[in-house]
Amino acid sequence: MAEKRHGAWFGFGFCGFGQALGSGNSHHSVYSPEPLHASDDICQVSAGWSYTALVTRGGRVELSGSVSGAADGCRDVWASEELLVLLRNKGGSSTEVQAWVPGSALQGEPLWVQNLVSGAKGQGEDEPSRESRMGTLPLLPCARAYVTPEPPFCQPLAPELRVRQLELGAEHVLLLCAAGQVFSWGAGRHGQLGHGTLEAELEPRLLEALQGLRMAKVAAGGWHSVCLSETGDIYIWGWNESGQLALPTRSGTENKAEREEATELNEDGLKEELAVADAGAPAHFIAIQPFPALLDLPLGSDAVMASCGSRHTAVVTRTGELYTWGWGKYGQLGHKDSTSLDRPCCVEYFVERQLEVRAVTCGPWNTYVYAMERDKS
């Protein structure tokens, strides 16, 4: 009989509100992965900017950071600054989606509730004993609607889309359908929609640049997007201000404090950088990539999972390595410093300890990873 391998969750990056991240000894940032100072049976993590929601295998959700609180019967969770969304068992086979104000600490009444059809399940919800899982929220289990942080909180989706995965960026939406096609809509002024322009889209629009390629995963950052093909290729597009696309960036060579504090460019600044990049002389940096670009990892590694923070990107390879790049001011890249990177770099912490990374999920300014001991056989 094979020896049971042990796994654990790790965290690194911003923890200025006391959210569960590493050992809990840091007042502001964690620059290298540390085991979570939390329950041993955590199976899911969802992080907002100022707080984190942890779900145990027994279905208990626990909040840490700027808000606290706990509740039982949780099957899935999605955390944002505006809204905390839970998928909860309500007795028997009854299930409901609850949208809470994060500061309510899960006390009183939720802002919004929707009862689900009996037996409706999201991907991974029928395996509560798994050591780690990725929920489907903000996509509802029926796959015909999704939750948004603003009223009316629930937006319908056309049934013909046959949605497999849906991710929300700061101003845009990515959708992966059952046929492996990717759709996007929302604001586009940072190129995050991938249609080759900076125009907004009000309805789901097919990414024509990826037609003929079957995609397996999508991930939405603040203003950038990633998708992974079924064969492990990475396609990436959108805003590259901090190198989150792994393309040459001005902020990688300039040391300007105001750029580290910025959260987005205004339209004038955006046009100015585009003009420089499009000038006759060869551009030394790329501010915006408005359509999908193929990205190769070192050693030609295949990618099986991706997650994006506000301005950083994390990818797990088929062989269990973690690569991160982009904005690193709070240690969210896990490379023991606050350096931002415009190229994928392996997080050596897990390699040095013979740990195989199985899952990654990014908060806006931090990163959570599930890893387990490598098979020694």
Curated annotation (Swiss-Prot):
Entry's localization field: Chromosome
Cellular component terms per the entry's GO annotation: chromosome; cytosol; plasma membrane
Keywords noted in UniProt: Chromatin regulator, Chromosome, Hydroxylation, Repeat
Pfam family, one: RCC1
Modified residues annotated as (3R)-3-hydroxyarginine in this record: R144
Chain spans, region Interaction with KDM8: 1-172
Quaternary structure and partners: Found in a complex with KDM8. Interacts (via N-terminus) with KDM8 (via N-terminus).
Name assigned to this protein: RCC1 domain-containing protein 1
Species for this entry: Mus musculus (Mouse)
Gene (name only): Rccd1
